[in-house]
C-alpha cells in the first residue's frame, strides 16, 4: 500500500471567504502537505482570491459571485471539462467539506471515474435552507439536492455525534463516522503583556469580569440570548465587559439591539479579526467564552478558547457541549437568557473558579489539528481499501 496519498480537499468557501469550514479546509491541506502526503484545495473561483499566498495547489472552478459581507461564491461545476481536470490529477480520494456545489462536483467525477469520496458534514444546513429559501417547491428541491450529494459519498463523517440529527432531517439514513475537528491555535498561557495591550486598547478596567463571543454575527447562533442575559446582569448592578469578535449578516442589527438595551458601555464590538495571534489575545483576557449556539455541530471556538485555558458556557445537550462536564472542563446552562445570567453570576465573582475549569478544558478537550488530521488521514486508507474491495 502506498502510504503517501494525494487528496482533493473540496470546500465551497476558501479565503478570502472566511468561515469555520474554510478554516478546516486550510488545516487539512496544511497538515497533509507537511509530510503525510499531498493535498490540493478544490474550491470555486473568487474575484478577490490571492492563492499565491498558500504553499499548496489551489484548483479553482467556475462560480457566480455574491456581493455580500461574507463574500461567498456559488460554485458552478457543470462543465464536462471540469470533471476531466479532476480526473487528470490522479487523486487517491476526494474529500468534500460541504454537501453543496463541490460535493456535486465530486459526485459527477466519481460517476465518470472510479475514485472514493468522503463527505464531512459540518453545518446544520436546515437552518439556512428554512430561513433563506422561499416556498415549499424550492425548499424540497434543495433538500433533495443535498440528500443526493450526501448519499453519493462512500463514507460520511460528522464532527460530533449530535450532528447526525441534522443528517436525518435531510433523509440520510446511512452510516457515519465521528471525526472531530482540531484547533489551529497552540496551547498557550497568553502573556500578561498581550493582555495589557488589549486592556488598554479597549479601556477595560482591571478586575472587571470579561466575557467573549467569537464567531459569525448571525441571530441563529443565539446571540440574542447573550445580549438579553447581559441586560439582566446590568439591571442587577453587575459590572462586566463583553467582547464580540467577528462579523456577519446580522451585525448591524445586533449592534442596534444591544444599544437599544442600554449595553453600549458594556459591550466592545471589535468586528472582523483575522490575525490568529490577536484572537488568542482576546481569549487570553477573557474569563469565559459565551457560546449558547445550538446551531453549530462542533464549535471550533470552544477548542480555541481551551487552547488559552479559557472555559466556555454552553447549552446542555448541544453539539458544542459534547465532551463537556459541567464545572469540570466547562459550564452548562439552559437555552434561555435567564439561565445564562444565573450561571454568569455564579461564575464571575470567583476568578479562580473559571481559571481552574479553563485549565481542565485545556488538558481535556483541546485537540490539535496535527492529531485530528493524522486520524483522518489514517481513515482515508480504510476508505480506499473498502472502496477497492467493492470494485
Where are these regions (language model features)?
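Short acidic/histidine- and often glycine-rich active-site loop of Leloir-type glycosyltransferases
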Residues: 128, 316-327, 331-332
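Short alpha-helical donor nucleotide-sugar binding micro-motif in glycosyltransferases
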Residues: 150, 272, 280-286
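Aromatic "clamp/platform" in nucleotide-sugar-dependent glycosyltransferases that forms part
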Residues: 294
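A short, well-ordered alpha-helix in the C-terminal region of glycosyltransferases
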Residues: 353-367
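Donor nucleotide-sugar binding/catalytic pocket of nucleotide-sugar-dependent glycosyltransferases
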Residues: 43, 57-62, 139, 143-194
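Short hydrophobic beta-strand element within catalytic cores of glycosyltransferases
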Residues: 311-315
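Conserved acidic donor-binding segment of nucleotide-sugar-dependent glycosyltransferases
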Residues: 326-327, 331-337, 346-351
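Nucleotide-activated donor-binding/catalytic signature segment of Leloir-type glycosyltransferases, i.e.
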Residues: 255-273
Amino acid at each position: 500500500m502506498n502510504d503517501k496519498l494525494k487528496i482533493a480537499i473540496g470546500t465551497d468557501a476558501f479565503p478570502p471567504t472566511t468561515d469555520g469550514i474554510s478554516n478546516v479546509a486550510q488545516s487539512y491541506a496544511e497538515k497533509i502537505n507537511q509530510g503525510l502526503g499531498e493535498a490540493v484545495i478544490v474550491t470555486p473561483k473568487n474575484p478577490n482570491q490571492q492563492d499565491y499566498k498558500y504553499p499548496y495547489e489551489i484548483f479553482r472552478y467556475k462560480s457566480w459571485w455574491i456581493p455580500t459581507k461574507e463574500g461567498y461564491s456559488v460554485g458552478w461545476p457543470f462543465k464536462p471539462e471540469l470533471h476531466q481536470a479532476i480526473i487528470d490529477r490522479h487523486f487517491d480520494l476526494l474529500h468534500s467539506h460541504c454537501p453543496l456545489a463541490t460535493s456535486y462536483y465530486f459526485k459527477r467525477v466519481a460517476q465518470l471515474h472510479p475514485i472514493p469520496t468522503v463527505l464531512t458534514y459540518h453545518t446544520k444546513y436546515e437552518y439556512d435552507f428554512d430561513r433563506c429559501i422561499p416556498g415549499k417547491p424550492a425548499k424540497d428541491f434543495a433538500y433533495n439536492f443535498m440528500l443526493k450529494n450526501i448519499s453519493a459519498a462512500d463514507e460520511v463523517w460528522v464532527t460530533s455525534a449530535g450532528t447526525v440529527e441534522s443528517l436525518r432531517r435531510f433523509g440520510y439514513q446511512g452510516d457515519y463516522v465521528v471525526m472531530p475537528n482540531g484547533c489551529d491555535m497552540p496551547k498557550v498561557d497568553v502573556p500578561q503583556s498581550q493582555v495589557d495591550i488589549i486592556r488598554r486598547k479597549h479601556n477595560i478596567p482591571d478586575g472587571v469580569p470579561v466575557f467573549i463571543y467569537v464567531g459569525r454575527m448571525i441571530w441563529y447562533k443565539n446571540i440574542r440570548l447573550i445580549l438579553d442575559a447581559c441586560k439582566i446582569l446590568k439591571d442587577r448592578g453587575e459590572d462586566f465587559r463583553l467582547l464580540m469578535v467577528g462579523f456577519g449578516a446580522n451585525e448591524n442589527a445586533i449592534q442596534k439591539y444591544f444599544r437599544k438595551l442600554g449595553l453600549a458601555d458594556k459591550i466592545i464590538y471589535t468586528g472582523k479579526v483575522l490575525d490568529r495571534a490577536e484572537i488568542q489575545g482576546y481569549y487570553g483576557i477573557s474569563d469565559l467564552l459565551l457560546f449558547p449556539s445550538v446551531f453549530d455541530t462542533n464549535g471550533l471556538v470552544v477548542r480555541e478558547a481551551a487552547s488559552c485555558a479559557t472555559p466556555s458556557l454552553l447549552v446542555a445537550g448541544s453539539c458544542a457541549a459534547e465532551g463537556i462536564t459541567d464545572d469540570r472542563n466547562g459550564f452548562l446552562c439552559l437555552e434561555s437568557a435567564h439561565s445564562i445570567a444565573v450561571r454568569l453570576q455564579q461564575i464571575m465573582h470567583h476568578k479562580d473558579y473559571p481559571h481552574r475549569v479553563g485549565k481542565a478544558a485545556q488538558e481535556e478537550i483541546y485537540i490539535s489539528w496535527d492529531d485530528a488530521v493524522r486520524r483522518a488521514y489514517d481513515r482515508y486508507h480504510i476508505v480506499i481499501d473498502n472502496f477497492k474491495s467493492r470494485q
